[in-house]
């Protein structure tokens, strides 16, 4: 694919080379584009990632309003509709997910590509309240202090979160460099432990299970 060939080694290193429809590449800026697609494959938002450091932010997220402004295309939307669409365009996979069954919320779009029926956020620094009233929502945020603190907030409210510590101990992975689902997928690709088959067993909404996060 001529739009992604320069970024192919990076995508392959993260086992994303079979999902090229979600990516583009800007050879001038040396930026990878991660697309938020609807069910028809139309772009409703995107995130860029620097493949060569320039000293600026590694990730930049573009909502639909910003895209239209850059292209100088009038959107002809009311302020209310524009606010709603901008919100949707920052939730990767939101237009492809079935909330009638369990769906998983990740910190970013890359991890969400490795699990069916998932949504990718654009980080967890802001409050995540959009899914608080949806009983089928569950959180698999990063295995770091920021992600775990956010999941502690959620499990205290009775929402399902992934118990990283319990999972990693069970499969002898404590001490491995596994920060997120993509890291886990890469580890499993090399080592074939079978651990991915049992991920569902390590979600809990019991506040007493906070010690296993």
Regions found by a protein language model. Give the residues of each.
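TOPRIM fold recognition
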Residues: 39, 44, 100-103, 109-213
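TOPRIM metal-binding catalytic domain and adjacent DNA-binding surface shared by DnaG-type primases
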Residues: 1-44, 68, 75, 79-81, ...
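Phosphate-handling DNA/RNA-contact segment within nucleic-acid enzymes
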Residues: 30-136, 150-151
């Amino acid at each position: 694919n001529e739009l992604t060939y320069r970024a192919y080694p990076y995508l392959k290193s993260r086992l994303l080379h079979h999902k090229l429809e979600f990516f583009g590449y800007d050879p001038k800026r040396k930026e990878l584009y991660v697309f938020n697609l609807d069910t028809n494959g139309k772009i409703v938002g995107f995130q860029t990632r620097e493949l060569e450091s320039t000293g600026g932010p590694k990730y930049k997220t573009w909502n639909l309003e910003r895209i239209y402004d850059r292209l100088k295309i009038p959107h002809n939307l009311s302020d209310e509709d524009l606010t709603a669409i901008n919100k949707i365009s920052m939730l990767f996979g939101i237009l492809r997910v079935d909330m009638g069954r369990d769906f998983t919320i990740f910190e970013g779009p890359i991890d969400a590509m490795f699990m069916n029926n998932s949504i990718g956020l654009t980080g967890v620094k802001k409050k995540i309240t959009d899914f608080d009233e949806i009983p089928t929502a569950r959180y698999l945020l990063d295995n770091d202090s920021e992600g775990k603190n956010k999941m502690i907030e959620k499990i205290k409210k009775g929402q399902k979160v992934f118990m990283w510590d319990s999972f990693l101990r069970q499969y002898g992975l404590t001490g491995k460099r596994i920060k997120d689902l993509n890291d886990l997928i890469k580890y499993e690709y090399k080592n074939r432990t079978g651990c991915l088959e049992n991920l569902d067993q390590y979600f809990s909404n019991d506040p007493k299970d906070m010690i296993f996060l």
